[in-house]
Amino acid sequence: MRATTRRVFVAGPAGRIECAVDSPESSPRGYAVIAHPHPQFGGTLDNKVVQTLARAFVELGYEAWRPNFRGVGQSEGRYDEGRGEVEDLAAVVAQIAGQGIVLAGFSFGAAMQARLAARVKPERLVLVGTAVLNFDVPPVPRGSLVIHGEQDTTVPLAAVLDWARPQDLPLVVVPGAEHFFHRRLHLLRDIVESYCR
């Protein structure tokens, strides 16, 4: 399925939020909001894991929204240690105001989406390489998809297992994958597409 991509701006609590919106050829079945990795370490809406997630959701018929957090790209504001970034995501979800919202995120973005999920009750929650070491990541709803690389040295698999264990939360572990899923992006896409069909 081919997607068309457009840039839009959403009013956020710290100013304009830049978003790339990837639309399927036909009317969307829902909306996926995909959050990028840490803004102070090069995370943007063009991150390859974020783009892979967007392609998977478009293939499934969702419209994929990829916002830049405050202070990144053309988004206004400055980094707020995870507090304001959750509010940025909430502003994007409010702008969409549609049924069938999926929240997805990678690394820092996954931690922020886990925080937002308690407030907006998404249809689905997809967390990839969740940054559980440096951020308070709350328990997530049953049925959430949590994907992690076996060889992740940025957020070791053991740390994610320690976070997931008290929740009885299953994890999908991608063998041989490190934090950025080099040479494993196709597996990441397949997992997401299977989960959200």
Predicted segment positions?
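Gly/Ala-rich beta-loop-alpha elbow adjacent to hydrolase catalytic centers
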Residues: G105-Q113
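Short beta-strand/loop motif that positions the catalytic acidic residue
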Residues: V140, L145-H148, D152
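N-terminal cap/lid segment of alpha/beta-hydrolase-fold proteins
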Residues: M1-S27
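Post-His helix in hydrolase/transferase enzymes
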Residues: H182-Y195
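Short, surface-exposed "cap/lid" segments of acyl-processing enzymes
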Residues: R16, E25-N68
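Alpha/beta-hydrolase active-site loop
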Residues: V49, R78-A97
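Conserved alpha/beta-hydrolase "acid-adjacent" motif
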Residues: T153-A159
